[in-house]
């Protein structure tokens, strides 16, 4: 067979298809398009763009809700007309009363006259009297107030209900579209986008958009309606005074504009900082076992806190700016008061253009307008925050994916042979444009043949497979299928023709049957059973208690590596693909499993094009064609024998792997003894239900989720059993009681001086309003004075007091804004930090709980800490403000008329009842809403963390359906909330009018029969009315308050939990001369999440200092569990693990783990530089660069790193995604070496490496093992045969132990294990 690479001609569907142009212009255009899209744009979302997802029904709901809000807003200006008329009547009545109290005056013929004066004098100076029946007038006005109150009740209910419902509908649609758009994105986009950041956007940012388009907008419309009607009425009743009052309005407008722009900018910066912190939290929680193994808890808390400090800084600036401009606007409003009364009194007293009632009408209308503009400005912060939050969301939604995996475009071939050809393909990853992966690659893969791709790590083998799946498009050249450029083919159809089995299989948290059905949605149960049989998975599945309905756990964490791999193969086989891609498909398997899986793969070779990437040459040897890769180029092609004769790349790899052994002899041994493997199914296939959670130490590099989290199955499929199981598991969602506020505030104690100053400032601000009502009623009373000079003098005094109030307000409002922003942001940072630290301090068994998977925990960190501010921070200031307002107002009211005050305060319990009901109901709704969104967050986390698998098997649509089901639950909760919230809000608004109605009715009686002054009636009514408004305003905080108590309860539940294995504890034994002697004594163990499955059943084995102990046995026998017990991820249920004669349960955990290093098969790297990842090996002290480089050299890593453009500062990407497996492994080994441990744990440390890398890494490991106690888990004999002790484990018990020679001589289980399955070199 020729070893040259042939470039065949290409069939074109049409000349207009630019995909076939050879100059690469199309590719360059795509590349530039991608780069343009990936750039962080300066696009800002306009407010009205937030409603882009509204339907016609939503528009009608918003229109009706808007009309209700506008009509509601007109109620207050409308009632001021009545108030003005009432004021004139009161003043006339009071003047008449004062005149009649003068000795010598009497009312004659409705005129007050001097009894002894002449008729002419009396006609000139007489005052009309006896025409005002004050009580009957008050009855009439009382009826009008009551009517307006009932109208407000109705309008307020529909105003809130309609806006909350339409907001929920639009947010539901936005979440759907956002998730759908993300699921359409090409893989290159995910390389440049943090999954943790996306989860934060789902959890936090969309919630901020909801705040901007729901009930807050209703409040804004209501307030603006009040403001506009007030202004119009003011101009109608007296344009001169209105213009004077409005003279300062441009300054108010400027203030509002500055607030909006500043808040938007600070919010954007704050959100970016929180998103970065969220990304770190997601990465760390997903890699919790690596963090625990290397003692990185405190280091990760510090890394997380650094980003919180940035967010805190911007939050404080936001509070300062808000406080200053709020004070600035209140100052202008009080200056307006002074100016209005000074000039208005001139128009009343000197020019007599206005009556006092008209003056009051104009003044109150314009001031009411100004105040409502001020209140509406607080909504601007929410709107600005919503727009800032929407920027990233909408950029993603509007971005057109370069490769749209759900597009209907492209051709579908009627028949497919399966011939694949690479034509001069050059490629680099979008996230690393400076590193060329494929360099002018050309090769042909013939239909129906098995083609093996071999080469060193980083040569481009796996990249070639990703191009075939069209995860990426070539930068230059093209890939063709049966002569057609794959870019011209429908991408969904293309991926349906391809089956993929990877080294690190991703299973989804549902049943085994549903995981296999992911391969083909319309598969019947018979198809699933057959696929399982073909993958040699049927027997182990049927041995499980629930068989095909067994839940696999998060990421397949409930299963061993071999079991997961066989389920993944079944999933690929059920598709009956024309092309099968095997990317290290059997490297993670033990010998027995590999043999069975290889047998399954051999069954389906006929009629399929198979492309295999493998490092075990025993797997490669049987291929029809082998293509050797080197530096992104296919350098040789041929059969096993042809390439050996050529003595090129392949020959070198074979030579390295065989280590001088005769490959043909190895094959004959396998053929001779393979028949003996039949007995091993019974001996080794049982044991633990999973391979002692192999994933506990080695994480999937592609997954952000912890493999040990056992979640209920997500409803990602239509299959009834899966969905039912999901529902049944809902009962496991833990309810929490709302946290007491005093405990929340206890966490703010370090900021007590800020809270004290802020509370004093808030108290002063709260007292300002009652003082204003006192001054206002006093000013009204001056108009009934008989002496005009006295009137002027008192009015000028009142105006001076208003100026003083304005000056005080600007100072105290700034202090309130700054101090509570400071205390609130520090609390948020503290809670996030404490929460994150508490999470990292939990025992590993806690993470096994379905309620604590990384997606849920990250969501809680993102939302709960910020929501706690609903009961602290600026909310405390608002509450103190309202409380002081109420107390001061009641004191003033009871001082001037206790009888009238009592009548009005009768209405207070109704307000309190309304608020209590609202708080109670909304607390429940907040909890339900959070549960629904956490389940939705779990779905998004699983889908996005495993996006390559999701895209490869084409199940985006199923995740989208599951996500939308959870959104529907959240929507139903919102609808129920709308009704309760609307009723409570309406009641709190309408009750004030009803209270006024009763007050004026009884006030009229007190004036008529008990001689109460009308100014006292105004004083009492306005004071209590304002305090009632404060009560209503307090209850408007109840939604935030309800959320805050639930969120705080979750935090306290976490902080209060005492983990059985406490990593932060200083207790426990430590000793200087740590030797590394290990004894497992009769250890029995079951995982907390699976108490019915016995994993270890009396394991006993010892290893002396400096010796190497190798654990061998079939998948699932409990090998890796022993490592976890040694690391104290868990403690044995019975028995003891002894370290140097000390019971591990009594040893200090940090001390124990600091003396243990681990290298696992699937190493977890962090999203930072290579240097930082190496230094992570020892977090107890600062590692020098020289020491890290020395470790890299020992791990055979240094030369590779120095070839990179940024060398040791090269970022490895999320979970090391920018590196090949071999490169990641060598970094992990360097990390372990730099730790200099006394005990070294090697869990399949070289199985993921290519032959060349394995040789160098094994040399490094052999050197690292010197002088250390070492425990090795491996499937390759070459790795373990030189061990001092080899322990054969079956069903959680050591059944044989000894040296290699001793065990082979016994011809027992070890002997059978060696000769069964894939050849062991």
Swiss-Prot record:
In this UniProt entry, which residues form the Extracellular topological domain(s)? Answer: 84-147, 237-240, 341-353, 777-794, 1001-1011
Q: Which GO terms describe its cellular component?
A: apical part of cell; apical plasma membrane; cell surface; endosome; Golgi membrane; intercellular canaliculus; intracellular canaliculus; membrane
Q: Which residues cross the membrane?
A: 63-83, 148-168, 216-236, 241-261, 320-340, 354-374, 756-776, 795-815, 870-890, 891-911, 980-1000, 1012-1032
Q: Indicate where the modification Phosphothreonine is found in the sequence.
A: 586
What biological-process terms (Gene Ontology) are attached?
bile acid and bile salt transport; bile acid metabolic process; canalicular bile acid transport; cellular response to xenobiotic stimulus; cholesterol homeostasis; fatty acid metabolic process; lipid homeostasis; phospholipid homeostasis
> Which of the residues bear the PTM Phosphoserine?
587, 692, 703, 706, 1321
Instruction: Describe the function of this protein.
Output: Catalyzes the transport of the major hydrophobic bile salts, such as taurine and glycine-conjugated cholic acid across the canalicular membrane of hepatocytes in an ATP-dependent manner, therefore participates in hepatic bile acid homeostasis and consequently to lipid homeostasis through regulation of biliary lipid secretion in a bile salts dependent manner. Transports taurine-conjugated bile salts more rapidly than glycine-conjugated bile salts.
Q: Give the record's family classification.
A: Belongs to the ABC transporter superfamily. ABCB family. Multidrug resistance exporter (TC 3.A.1.201) subfamily.
Q: What name appears for this protein in its UniProt entry?
A: Bile salt export pump
